[in-house]
Amino acid sequence: MTQTVTQALQDFSLRYQQAWQNKHNELPRNEELADLVSPCVEEKCDGAVLWKAFPREEMADFTNVENAIELTLHEDIKAFYGSQYSADMDATWQTNPLTLLQVWSDDDFVRLQENILGHLVTQRRLKLKPTVFIAATDAELDVISICNLTGNVILERLGTDKREVLAENVVEFLAKIEAAV
């Protein structure tokens, strides 16, 4: 049976949590999110939160973004951002560091939608094929995105047409990245 994006994301989240616990003997810790409410929070301690990914009861709705930009988002994009709450997770792709972007709370989801919309508007203005970012890299202008037309996971230079396919789809990409704790 073919794995879904939701399953692949849950699998990576568990691999990340296990790697963190193996190294630090506790759930993943985050100081930056300590004052923000989230269903991910398991415990607060020493100005930080211990957290774990939390599945959404219902898939998040992207209709407002799709209507605003008059574009249907690829199902993989909606599943990637709409299936769970989580802190961002550090990982590597073929030894290259990245930060997998996630949604911490409903308030964070609103900010994400605004950022996706701004990204798509900029791409339309520059006459670039639409993509939605899923990970940040160490290079300020390079992001890892899902191509809205093909579902390919790509490394792209923001504001340009420079793109490199990393994986056929997000399920393959998530299976091949390694948790970096």
Swiss-Prot record:
It is a peripheral membrane protein. It is found in: Cell inner membrane. Its main location: membrane. CDD domains: Syd (cd16323). Gene3D superfamilies: Syd protein (3.40.1580.20). One of its GO terms (cellular component) is cytoplasmic side of plasma membrane. Keywords: Cell inner membrane, Cell membrane, Membrane. Pfam families: Syd. HAMAP family: Syd (MF_01104). Belongs to the Syd family. Interacts with the SecY protein in vivo. May bind preferentially to an uncomplexed state of SecY, thus functioning either as a chelating agent for excess SecY in the cell or as a regulatory factor that negatively controls the translocase function. This is Protein Syd. It comes from Vibrio parahaemolyticus serotype O3:K6 (strain RIMD 2210633). The gene is syd.
